[in-house]
């Protein structure tokens, strides 16, 4: 399966899939399987931490001043960003609840993420948001079910 993912990543020119597949292949071939459980338990948290670090670098480096931040938040797009952030966290909560209730759904999320990377040139940011959107779509399907 990992070789298939590697080939898909190479065909799609997706460095993210290629790197992830290579790392997992190396871990598997070197028989350090304990890292799999660590990645399974804490990988999402570690990935989100690095994502947050990259977003906060302008604050830490001084490239963004408090005046610029306040000005940005007071703008229309800044207010929409606050609303978007609040909505995203709400969807993430729904996603977490869905993953807890139906853990097997992660395979569909994985396939959907791969298809999104390959065909839509998307960037996977994590299963929580994908699960949150799935939970929302499931709720809408129940509402509009004939």
UniProtKB/Swiss-Prot annotation:
Coiled coil: none annotated. InterPro entries: UPF0756_TM. Its main location: membrane. GO terms for cellular component: plasma membrane. It is a multi-pass membrane protein. It is found in: Cell membrane. It comes from the Bacteria. Keywords: Cell membrane, Membrane, Transmembrane, Transmembrane helix. The keyword Membrane applies. The chain crosses the membrane at residues 6-26, 46-66, 69-89, 105-125. The keyword Isomerase does not apply. PANTHER family: UPF0756 MEMBRANE PROTEIN YEAL (PTHR38452:SF1). Belongs to the UPF0756 family. This is UPF0756 membrane protein PTH_1817. It comes from Pelotomaculum thermopropionicum (strain DSM 13744 / JCM 10971 / SI). The lineage of its organism: Bacteria, Bacillati, Bacillota, Clostridia, Eubacteriales.
């Amino acid at each position: 399966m990992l070789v298939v993912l590697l080939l898909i990543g190479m065909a799609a020119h997706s460095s993210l899939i290629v790197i992830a597949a290579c790392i997992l292949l190396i871990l598997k071939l070197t028989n350090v399987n304990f890292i799999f459980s660590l990645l399974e338990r804490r990988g999402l948290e570690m990935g989100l931490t690095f994502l947050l670090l990259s977003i906060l670098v302008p604050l830490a480096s001084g490239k963004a001043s408090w005046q610029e931040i306040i000005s940005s938040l007071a703008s229309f797009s800044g207010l929409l960003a606050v609303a978007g952030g609040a909505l995203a966290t709400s969807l993430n909560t729904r996603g977490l609840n869905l993953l807890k209730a139906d853990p097997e759904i992660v395979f569909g999320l994985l396939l959907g993420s791969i298809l999104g990377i390959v065909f839509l040139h998307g960037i996977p940011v994590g299963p929580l948001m994908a699960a949150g959107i799935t939970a929302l779509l499931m709720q809408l399907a129940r509402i509009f079910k004939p």
